[in-house]
Swiss-Prot record:
The keyword Nucleotide-binding does not apply. This is Outer membrane protein H.8. It comes from Neisseria meningitidis serogroup B (strain ATCC BAA-335 / MC58). Cu cation binds at residues 102, 166, 171, 175. GO terms for cellular component: cell outer membrane; plasma membrane. PANTHER family: AURACYANIN-B (PTHR38439), OUTER MEMBRANE PROTEIN H.8 (PTHR38439:SF2). The lineage of its organism: Bacteria, Pseudomonadati, Pseudomonadota, Betaproteobacteria, Neisseriales.
Amino acid sequence: MKAYLALISAAVIGLAACSQEPAAPAAEATPAAEAPASEAPAAEAAPADAAEAPAAGNCAATVESNDNMQFNTKDIQVSKACKEFTITLKHTGTQPKASMGHNLVIAKAEDMDGVFKDGVGAADTDYVKPDDARVVAHTKLIGGGEEASLTLDPAKLADGEYKFACTFPGHGALMNGKVTLVD
């Protein structure tokens, strides 16, 4: 029993040590990317997030992801005044998409668990079930240094509460946020 506990403890310590990233150079670091998004309450994060993903007549937003499984915002504000809204996902990390890939998937809040579940087996389609009617829009899966964009009609966000998340297996618990229709 002691050997079993020792093996489990060693495995946990090894995994924890392997998951730590070295400190990013100051030129790459941004305040929003450094702060763990999962620790900040949504109400406190909104003012800083608004600067990262603005709306109010601006019909585009950029969301950054990194090798620490974080988005730099918890709220994407989409203007009702826009005919089309484009979201660009930038992976600021260095790891390849096979080990630390990210995408950005938008769906109704109540549908997101099903989108995650159905996406797990869909590695060939970037962890998004093909033709999933619950998905409003999504980017392709990207690795470090890459970017991808999606374009959506804001009218699709009129009914209900919408969320965005990364559907790469295991990432959605940390990498998610709210899509807010404004104006």
